[in-house]
């Protein structure tokens, strides 16, 4: 648009729209009035279009990123939740596994996704650890915690110390005594540095004063397979990941990082009860990019709650050994912030792990 000022007719302001449209406007009042009218009309049209899109949400399939391979807790929870949300939303919710870096790769992809409601994330508690680890190592962050908005927590279980059923260790005492006698000889698998399987083992090692060798994998599924195949000696993971193998007599659980008794493994003692001040919980929860419009965020929040109350979804999750412990968005956000604060100190104690 060109603004033409005629010096001989200073009271007249002419607006010329090049390449068609309005050719000439005479008079300052008329020009400004039409300009304002055009701007308001365009703004209202855009707002109306956005409102219509929000009201119609969703109009296509939604991608649920799972930042770990199949077989681990995030994937175990994500699949029945996605199915239940699909029924409520009237559109498919499609699982996409993006593993690596203790879940950081997939979490980063979700954080950078377009905030339009069509990308959601089923994360584990490593979400509160990885940003702290990035800062400690001085590396470019894979994502920032405030880039993801908590929508719903589904599970929160203490991890368990698991070994093969044919291993020489029948209890935690034997395991720790052997680790003290042979520093670095016992190895354990994890889902990656600073992940939900690495952190609890480091907490135990520091508490017990032992040294073990860490072997990272891309997720709990591959790590369990490696342990069953004799490639690693032990691991810490959620009960849901190993319960089927415990029932089949292939895996023995020595203890857990919680308090009291586990409903799925009532005969397993906590590390605290056995004299080791080691505590850790592996939670799973749904997140969306922080810039997601509020009406869309609330629609996803409602669908996430429906999934938490869905009988089929609850049965599937609970039958794996992880009872549903649902938290709605506001309470889950407080929970995540508290967990992040606690993990700051844990990461500092673990130190740099390349």
Model-derived segments and spans:
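A ligand-binding cleft/hinge motif common to bilobed small-molecule-binding domains
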Residues: 126-137, 198, 202-207, 234-267
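An extracytoplasmic/periplasmic, membrane-proximal ligand-sensing/linker region
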Residues: 59-61, 206-210, 294-354
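Short hydrophobic alpha-helices and adjacent helix-cap/hinge residues
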Residues: 2-5, 32, 53-54, 87-88, ...
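Beta->alpha turn/N-cap motifs
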Residues: 122-127, 190, 219-220, 237-242, ...
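Short, low-complexity disordered leader/linker segments with a strong preference
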Residues: 1-59, 354
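Hinge/capping helix and adjacent helix->loop/strand transition within the periplasmic-binding protein
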Residues: 109-118, 131-222, 271, 276, ...
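Extracytoplasmic/secreted proteins, especially bacterial periplasmic and envelope-associated proteins
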Residues: 76, 80, 84, 88, ...
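N-terminal (or domain-start) structured segment
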Residues: 53-147, 185, 193, 209-236, ...
